[in-house]
Structure formats: structure tokens, C-alpha cells
Amino acid sequence: MAENRGERRAAVENRYDAWDHEQAMKAAVRKFISYDQFSAQLRNWREARLNIIEHATSVLSQVSNLGRTHFYSRTERFGGSSLVGDKLYVCLNETRMKTALNNIIVALQTVNGEGRARRLGPREASANTGGEDSALNVAHQLAEVDDLLTDESFLREAVFTQDKYELVNGLRWAGAXQLTAQAFWFDVNAAIDEIDNRLLAAAALRLLPGQANHVDGLVSINYAQLDRALSVVGGNILPQTLEITRDERKRQLPEVRVIDGERVTIRNKDEATVIRNHGQGLPWLLAFLLLLLSVVVVYSTIYLNDWLYRLSVVRHGKPGGGAARKLSGMSDWLCSRLRARGALNVNRMRKKQACDPSPTGLRKFLTCYNFSYELWDPTGSYDDAQRRIIAEQNSFVEAVRAIDEGDRELAEACLTNVRRILRRHLNYRPDYFDIIEAKAVYLVTVLTNAMSGPVVGVDDDERRAVVAAFNPSDCGLPNLDSCSLDEIKNFDLSEVVIGEGTNVEQARGYLNLCRNIQCMIETIGTVQFLGVLSSYTGPQYPCISQAFAEDKRIRKERLKDKDNITTADIIAYLVSGVMVAYALVAVSKGGITLFKFMKNYAGGGGDRPGSSRRIRQLEAALPSLPQPEELTMMERLRRPQSSDNDLALRRNPSDMLSQVVRDVVADVDSSDIAESLNDPARMTEAALEIRLTRIMSAEGSPVDVIEPGGQELISMQVHGESLTVINAGTDSPTVIRSASLSTRHRSSGIEIGSFAVDKVLPYEVEGENDDHGDAGKKPTVAQALMIGGGAVKGQGNLGVTNGKELLKVLGSSRSIGKMSGKMAV
């Protein structure tokens, strides 16, 4: 079955697809030569500059026949079908190269002094001077060609590899062992730029054929370009934020003029390269805005600190002073924290150790790894655990170095080692690992191509016979000609043990081939697999074909999801924009409102009111407010409504006096009441007065009299409510509810003045004209008792003549009705 597959592959003709007349004309006209052969020939000519004149005919023939046309054709691949790796070729049709070679040919043709004769004339020229003239001219032209081989623009335009030339001209090689088509997401321009970047890096490091292998001094390397060159392998692996188009103008050739018989070479200054950036630059804009915001925050923190302090001093005791003082304190705290953090970082930088052989130190090293190849020194007083960590760091660095240097044999093992160390010490995938993995997978793919390709010194028939004679199942290895993608992916090659036998070397090579294929297919669906797609030219095993199909399916699904998400993202961006605009408006309004509040209402840092402006506004609006009615207390009592400020429901003064008498009688002994009822003649005013005095002395007066500052105060309980009377000894006592006073301890006395206006009830003894308002008809206690008891009115001299006596009488009772008199606020 394998033989039939080989016959079918051999039946497919190797050729270029899309070959047309234009491609045929290019192949017939263009002359190519390998870069190493051309540089070696050029070095020989420069070392034997004087001998060139002696062998002018031979050298002229070499220069004239340099390179060859029909370097490739429809059925002959550019550079050869069995090419492995990157081999450089120079196009001799490039304008500057063609002009330099023509000048060398002209100089060699004038060996007999023709060039000097043209400048000085035939009389002054001699035949033996032509060699010196031609040798000098040839030396200049050879130096120019040597400089041209390392020129940046020349490397981009006239130096090609097999892949670069096919990508530039749109050629696609179709054969039995090659890919028939490129992936639809393959970026040709990015692949060409990747090859050019490698050429430029090799020229800067003096690694091109013919360059000196040593450089005086240190070599400056642009690590940003180097990282991009390492990451972009065979395609546009890393997505670019900005689309860059390079607009380069070709170098103008030196102009040769004849002035006064002398040939003068005029070199024009090359124009600078113009690079235009266009495309989606939103991430760069956001980065710039964040940088600008950071600068504004830092500057505001530094500048506003002093400004807020001055503001807090100026506004002390004024509106906004308290808020300014708090903001100044917050700014001082923030500045102190920034200074402390900066001092801590500086101290850490000063005391930074060469290495930190601890799990935390290695984790920090792996997190901040920047492709440095500095190894930790294991010599020192370290324990076993620290030495193991140092060994892991050295192993990691050496593995990355081997991958970076392009060691194809160790690429798979080094990548496995790097993965193992990262998985052990980090719980995430760092960004730089994509660069390492892309380069390693590319090297593994190139090695797989070489292992599957022809062997030097062994013909194809013999190689196929050896492969057919080897049976992988005998060594416990999977058969790549029949196993599927899942089988090779899930096969554990670590358990395979190669025993002693006749096919040990072949079994080990087959095992390495299986490991390389496993390493390649592990990157299916990632950007690293693009390197496999673009560079794999080995046999199309079933697992390889399934891997390509699976990767294509995954990318199509992602592209479809990306298109669907794009529409949703547009809607989300619009909604976010509206919300941001609304938030900005709300923040602006809130800021204005807060500023007005801080200006008008915020309390100052001193004793002044919070806002004199607000007070003036209230004073201006006061005349327009409705004024309260000026009514007397009796007018309010006569209204058919009750108020919570009244002491009780309003009643007739006679009823109130009768109630007082009844309350007094209730405290009298029942035997006295019965005696007075049986013998009313004994109940004279003197007897009643004596009885009343005895009762009052027995119970004690519930009235406390305090005289602070000449004002007599009386505290009494009326209907369960505590009252305080001011100016009780005058004709106009003032009654105050004690609940309206400030709550203070009894030892500190009564605080005068801190009560509500509506709680003050002035009382005038000279009341309105009623049954008891006339001075001649003021009732005595005896009369009150007589009225309350229903007896006849007696005679006595105990009368209520002022407010103090009335309050004392009222205070001696358990309950009190409404007082008679004029009550007003």
C-alpha cells in the first residue's frame, strides 16, 4: 500500500502553479547567483587587485558571465527542489548592482590606457599607465559592490531566499511532498518582512557570507525588532495594531561628469525613508490618553498639595474652610505615601541581589524575563533547595538560548523543558513564551523536513527500501503512515524504550520524528501553528493532513465568532459612548452643585456662621412670608379648636375652683367631713384655715422656690406635667413647661433662656370681668370649700391677692383646672 502511495505521488508533476508569459520573461531575463559564491568571488578579486590587470581577459570573462539566466522555470524550482534551510541568492539585474558591474567591465576593457587617454589626451597618455588607471577604478567599483551587498535597501530588493522570491512573485510550487495551497489567513507581506528582518539582523551582526566574524566593540541590538523577527515566523503571527506601509525611494546612482578633461563622480545624498502609518490605531490612542491622564494626576498631586494648604489657611473661619482643610490633609497623606513608596523602591534597587534562589525569586525571574542569558552563580553558601532552583534557572536560560541560536536538534527538548519549568512555577502563560514556542516549532518543522528529505550519498530507491524494511510496531512506536491525529497526539513516547538491535539508529531517528510531529500538532489552533503551515514540506502523513484540516476548521470558527462579536461590539461601543457622555454630563453637574454647596453651605473653620449669603437671602424673603395672627390667650381659648400646647381642656373658672375645693376635701379625714355636715355652724373660716394649714404641713409643699439673680422661680407638678414659674412674686408670672428646658443635672440648677417661645404662658392676676374677677369679690379658700361642699358662704380673711399666693394654693392641690385670668403668648 505504501508503494502504491509512492507511485501516485511520483505521478504528480512538480511545477509552479499560475505560470504565465510574464513569469517566463522574468526567468529568461533575470540573472541570479548565490550570495556566498558571489561574496567569495568578490573577496578574491579585492585581495588580488593588481593581479586583475595581469589577468584582465580572464577576469573580464568571469565578470561578464557572472550569474545565469533561466535560474528557474515552470518545472524547475527557484534554488532547487531539495533545498533545506535558507540559502541566499542575489539578483544581478538590480539597477545599482548592474551599473557597478558594467563599470568594472568598462574598466577592464581599458587596460591599455584608454581611460587615461580619454581624460588627458593621446599626447600625455602612455600605454603603460593604463594598468594603474584601470586597477584604481576597479578597486573603487569592487568596494562599492561590497558595500552594496550589506546595504539595507539592497537586501530588501535584490537578495532573495526561495520562500521570499516565490512570495514576492506570487509563485506556488506544487509537488508530491509539498503543500498544495496556503492558508487563507496567511499574510504574504508579513512573511516577506520577516525574512527581510532576519537578513538585516544577520547583516548587523555580521553573519552574512563574506562578512568578518568579529566586530570591534559591542554590537547594539534593537531587541524590539529582534523579538518581532523571532515571533513572526512564516507569517503574520503577532497581530499588528497599526498597519505600516513603507514608501522607500531608490538610491540615486552616482553621476559621472567630465569637467576640464577630468572624470568626476558626483554622489547624490540618498533620500530618507518615509514610513506612513495607517489603520486601526485605537490601542495607541488609548495608551496615549492613559499616559496623559497619569501625567495630569501626578502633576495635580504635586501642585494641588500647596494650593490646598494655602486655600485652607485663607478660608479659615470662612465658607469652605473646613472642606479645604480636609482636602489638604488628604493631599498630604497621598504625597507622604508616594514619597514612602519611592524611597522603598530606591532602597530595594540599592540592595538588589544578583540572584534570589528561592521559589519567589525564580517566579519573579520568570515573570519579568526579558531574554537575558545571564546565569545565576551556584557558588556560594546555598542549601540543596536553593541549588536546585539555581539549576532550574540555568536550565531555563540555556534552553531559551539554544532555541534562539537555532539549534534544530535540541529545539524540541528545550521547548519541553521550558514548558515544564513554567508550568511548575507559574499558573499562567507568559507573553514571551509565544515567541519562544514559535521559534522552537519553526526549528522543529525544519528539522522534520530534513529528516524526511533525501540523504546525501543515498539514492531515493535505497532510502525507500530502508524505510520499507523498518517496522515501527516492533519498537513500540506508532506507524505514521496509518495512525490518525488523535492516536499520535495521545501516544506517550516517554514510555518507549529502544533496545539493542540492528535498527537502533533508525528507531531512534523515527522516535525523534514522532516527537517532532507531536510538538508540531500541539500548537493546532494557535498562531504558532502558522509556522508549521508555511514551512512544512515533508510527507503528507494522515496525522499531518488531519492537523491542517483541524487547524483550518478552528480558525474558521474563530473568524465566524469574531464577525458576530464585531457587530455586537459596535452596538456595545455606541451604548458605552452614550453612557460615558451621560456620565460626563452628570459628573459636570454634580461638580458644579458640589462647588456651590461648598461655597455657600460648607461650615467654615472658625466661629462665623456657615453662609452669610444664605442668611441675607432669608432676611430678604422674610417680609413676603405670612405673618402669624396676634391673638390673646382668651381669644385662642374661645376658638372651637384645641391645641397640643394647652395644659388641659378649657373649662369655666367656677368649675375649676369647685374642682380645687373637691380635691382639697378629698384629702380631709372622713370623720371631719361627717362632723362638718352634722354641725355646719362649727365650720367657720378660722376652723377651715386651721384644718387646711394642718393638711399642708403634713403633706409638705410640692412647690420648690429658687431665686437665681433676683428672679423668683417656682417648680411645680400640674396634671402630671412639670411646670416652672418665673416671676412668681409679681403680678405677671410666666409659666414654662420644664420639658422645653435643656436637660441638665439638678446640681447645676435651671438653665434660663433655652426654651421655645410657644412654651411660655404669661399669667396676669387682674383677669377679665367674671364672677371672680372683681377685687371685692375674690374668693377665699373657705369660700372655695363652701362652694365645693355646697355649704353656705362663710367669713374669713384668707384671700388670694397675687400670683404667688394663687400658685401656692394651686400647688397644694393634687389636680388643677384651668386658671382664671388673662393668658397670652
From Swiss-Prot:
One of its GO terms (molecular function) is structural molecule activity. The keyword Cytoplasm does not apply. This is 91 kDa readthrough protein. The lineage of its organism: Viruses, Riboviria, Orthornavirae, Kitrinoviricota, Alsuviricetes. InterPro entries: TMV-like_coat, TMV-like_coat_sf. Its main location: virion. Belongs to the virgaviridae capsid protein family. GO terms for cellular component: viral capsid. It holds the Pfam family TMV_coat. Keywords: Capsid protein, Virion. Minor capsid protein involved in virus transmission by the vector Polymyxa. Transmembrane segments: none annotated. This protein is translated as a fusion protein by episodic readthrough of the termination codon at the end of the capsid protein. Readthrough of the terminator codon TAG occurs between the codons for Ala-176 and Gln-178, thereby producing the 91 kDa readthrough protein.
